[in-house]
Amino acid sequence: MPPVDNAYKLRNQEFLQEYAQKPGVKIMFNGVMYREITKGHGQKPSPKSFISVYYTGKLINGKVFDQTQKGKPATFRLNELITGWITALREMPAGSRWEIVSPYNLGYGSRPAGAIKAFSTLIFDITLLDVR
């Protein structure tokens, strides 16, 4: 395992503290934060639900590491996703669009995952289209 980049880890912790102070940000029981962009009125998913979403995932520097293609939503089983998504999406009605911020321990943790460095805070813009 590569050595820990303590400066990077600290920048991510500082980002979380700053984000928590933004207007409209709600903090969930485990530290996931979200900001409602569009309020939906549909069904909320359960852990075994299949969800269809549009999303963009980026790091605190704004670098996009993953996203759906325009017009092609992704479908997932909720309980197979990272904890940050599971926590937020369980409370998100279909039709909603939220910005979700997941601390590293609820994302990919202390190990790198492809282009995502260890200790990365993950920022997602998620539109929940459908719950089945």
Kindly give the residue locations of the regions a language model identified.
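Cross-family detector of peptidyl-prolyl cis-trans isomerase
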Residues: 1-132
